[in-house]
Amino acid sequence: MFGVLNSDNHCAAVQQGNILAFGRTSSEFWTNNPTSSYRCETGGNRTDSGQSHIRRPMNAFMVWSRDQRRKVALENPQMQNSEISKRLGYQWKMLTEAEKRPFFEEAQRIQAMHREKYPDYKYRPRRKAVPKNSDKLLPAASSSMLCRQGNVDERWYPFTWRGGRTRASHSGTEDRLNSSQAANIVRSLLQQEHHCSSTSLRHSPETLAIQLSTDFYPK
């Protein structure tokens, strides 16, 4: 028995050592490989899409918020980027047309330069990645149905563990249980079902209404 336990512990230790060794080698590969480090810095594989991708020209709001965003971030270092964008959007709406005019003119100049540099440019928004169906969780109806099926299986098969493993083999069960014991088990289950059904029928609204009518209006 102790030999089996020691061998299991030894196997677990060997597996853990292999995992740690694989993690070290993979991390060394990523850090020593210049291509992989470039992917980590840029946030993905940009070897083919990075050269062909062309950024959109800035509009008037982007020209105005370029300096304002930096200023708000320095004044509020704990503020998140989404909150900064909300504040800048509100401030931009509060500006007058005269205050916005210089930024519109600058945006038109940037767009003209962009058209000259990239005459065949067309804006193509990136599509969001669609999650796989296998990663989705089961709906509530399916999970509740599985729970009900598990309860029914445990009720009608009392000689199985919850984990799905049988307590004994089929041959061992036949040796321990004879036909009379099996009949007694089935009879007790049927009696329980009959008792539950009769109890629910006794306390049903229709039965109570009939009893009340006979009490108030005797024949």
UniProtKB/Swiss-Prot annotation:
GO biological process terms, semicolon-separated: cell differentiation; male sex determination; sex differentiation
Localization annotation: Nucleus speckle; Cytoplasm; Nucleus
DNA-binding region, residue range(s): 54-122
PROSITE patterns to which the protein is assigned, alphabetical: HMG_BOX_2
Keywords: Activator, Calmodulin-binding, Cytoplasm, Differentiation, DNA-binding, Nucleus, Sexual differentiation, Transcription, Transcription regulation
Main location, first listed in the record: nucleus
GO molecular function: calmodulin binding; DNA-binding transcription activator activity, RNA polymerase II-specific; RNA polymerase II cis-regulatory region sequence-specific DNA binding
Cross-referenced Gene3D superfamilies: High mobility group box domain
SMART domains assigned to the protein according to its UniProt record, in alphabetical order: HMG
Signal peptide: none
GO CC terms in record: cytoplasm; nuclear speck; nucleus
InterPro entries linked: HMG_box_dom, HMG_box_dom_sf, SRY, SRY-related_HMG-box_TF-like
Pfam families: HMG_box
Coiled coil location: none
Function: Transcriptional regulator that controls a genetic switch in male development. It is necessary and sufficient for initiating male sex determination by directing the development of supporting cell precursors (pre-Sertoli cells) as Sertoli rather than granulosa cells. Involved in different aspects of gene regulation including promoter activation or repression. Binds to the DNA consensus sequence 5'-[AT]AACAA[AT]-3'. SRY HMG box recognizes DNA by partial intercalation in the minor groove and promotes DNA bending. Also involved in pre-mRNA splicing.
PANTHER family named among the record's database cross-references: SEX-DETERMINING REGION Y PROTEIN, SOX TRANSCRIPTION FACTOR
Assembly notes: Interacts with CALM, EP300, HDAC3, KPNB1, ZNF208 isoform KRAB-O, PARP1, SLC9A3R2 and WT1. The interaction with EP300 modulates its DNA-binding activity. The interaction with KPNB1 is sensitive to dissociation by Ran in the GTP-bound form. Interaction with PARP1 impaired its DNA-binding activity.
Family, as annotated: Belongs to the SRY family.
Protein's recorded name: Sex-determining region Y protein
Upper lineage: Eukaryota, Metazoa, Chordata, Craniata, Vertebrata
